């Protein structure tokens, strides 16, 4: 009886310590939701990188969506976050992250911070993340949220991501999270030799192809991955494409 009581108390203390380590606003309910998301939406669809799966288990996605949509945070769908932007569905976040083949030593540039969720996931599998958001309200909100959650290896700034972040270049990997009909030349120039770039490429107002671009010297190679639907990249990208 004494041993059983000791074991019971130990389990309670362990659970309390585990909950205490969770970010503010997280709970066992959301931990279970993330585990279900990983098992049912990611692993079954061939996401295999263990570090990516761990990141998806750990980052509290529900804190990055509007309060009215928290109940949908772990569903297999994109969600609106305001300013005409969305947070990508979990599978796409995991797929794009996995395509970069990060090992933990890389410096990554993200174009389109949005809610900050993708940057948070990247921060778990890369050394440093630099993220740019053109929508000032989203930029400010995401920056404050990422800081409050303790993501110290993320640098965020407001601006037009089309031109990249030349001061911090080159980057081992670049991710564009909005649709564009061409790969911005400044981003190709800021990609390190041997680096990888992933983006939704095609008509910004229709369906696109998720593509992977690799660089070897001045040789850039492109692989088509799958069909996707992203919101348009705004700013100079639309001007350059002739859209208004």
From Swiss-Prot:
Catalytic activity: [protein]-L-isoaspartate + S-adenosyl-L-methionine = [protein]-L-isoaspartate alpha-methyl ester + S-adenosyl-L-homocysteine
Active-site positions on this chain: 88
One Pfam family per UniProt: PCMT
GO CC terms: cytoplasm
Coiled coil: none
Record-linked SUPFAM superfamilies: S-adenosyl-L-methionine-dependent methyltransferases
Keyword S-adenosyl-L-methionine: yes
Chief location bin: cytoplasm
Record protein name field: Protein-L-isoaspartate O-methyltransferase 2
């Amino acid at each position: 009886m004494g041993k059983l009581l000791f074991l019971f108390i130990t389990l309670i203390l362990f659970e309390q310590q585990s909950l205490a380590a969770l970010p503010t606003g997280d709970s066992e309910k959301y931990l279970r939701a993330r585990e279900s998301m990983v098992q049912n939406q990611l692993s079954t669809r061939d996401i295999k990188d263990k570090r990516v799966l761990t990141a998806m288990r750990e980052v509290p996605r529900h804190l990055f969506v509007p309060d009215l949509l928290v109940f949908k945070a772990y569903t297999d769908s994109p969600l609106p976050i305001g300013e005409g932007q969305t947070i990508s569905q979990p599978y796409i976040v995991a797929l794009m992250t996995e395509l970069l083949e990060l090992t933990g030593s890389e410096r990554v540039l993200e174009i389109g911070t949005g809610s900050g969720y993708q940057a948070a996931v990247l921060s778990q599998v890369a050394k440093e993340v630099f993220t740019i958001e053109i929508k000032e309200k989203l930029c400010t909100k995401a920056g404050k949220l990422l800081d409050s959650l303790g993501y110290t290896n993320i640098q965020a700034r407001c601006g037009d991501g089309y031109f990249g972040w030349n001061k911090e270049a080159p980057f081992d990997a670049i991710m564009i999270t909005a649709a564009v009909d061409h790969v911005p030349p400044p981003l190709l120039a800021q990609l390190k030799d041997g680096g990888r770039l992933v983006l939704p490429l095609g008509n910004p107002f229709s369906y696109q192809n998720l593509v992977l671009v690799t660089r070897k010297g001045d040789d850039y190679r492109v692989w088509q991955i799958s069909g996707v639907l992203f919101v348009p990249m705004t700013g100079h990208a639309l001007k350059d494409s002739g859209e208004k």
